[in-house]
């Protein structure tokens, strides 16, 4: 599992007990150092690098996550890299935990659009092609 924008490694640490091997990357060396301190003995690999410059071997990961950070990335550069690094049928999970509609007007309008075009909340997946 690859966690992009891992910050202090909250997601890998919380998912560690489920058995997957995690790797976290973040642009901030300070965040990565904190992640390492908070994850002793977990075997989580942390690397300070921009998401667009990750360069792991082909088919290294079954899945990649981006929690609360995807809007910072240059998608034109990142997505081809991820497609290369994900295994066949690999998945990218983008987590965006937005404000509730009554707390933020723009978030509410966004939710209205999502519900209009996907009333069941179903998500369309796209395949990476090589």
Language model region names:
Residues 52-63:
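A short acidic, Gly/Pro-enriched loop at the edge of an enzyme's catalytic core
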Residues 83-130:
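Conserved catalytic/acceptor-binding region of the Class I
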Residues 2-4, 8-53:
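Class I SAM-dependent methyltransferase SAM/SAH-binding core
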Residues 73-82:
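A short, conserved alpha-helix within the catalytic core of class I
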């Amino acid at each position: 599992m690859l966690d992009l924008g891992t910050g202090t490694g909250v997601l890998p640490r919380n998912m560690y007990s489920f058995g997957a091997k995690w790797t976290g990357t973040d642009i901030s060396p300070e965040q990565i150092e904190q992640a390492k301190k908070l994850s002793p003995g977990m075997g989580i690999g942390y690397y300070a690098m921009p998401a667009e410059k990750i360069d792991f071997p082909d088919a290294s990961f079954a899945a990649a996550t981006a929690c609360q950070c995807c809007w910072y990335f240059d998608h034109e550069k990142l997505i081809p890299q991820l497609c290369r690094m994900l295994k066949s049928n690999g998945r990218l999970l983008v987590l965006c935990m937005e404000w509730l509609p009554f707390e933020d007007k723009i978030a509410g309008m966004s939710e209205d659009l999502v519900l209009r075009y996907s009333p069941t909340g179903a998500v369309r997946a796209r395949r990476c092609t090589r």
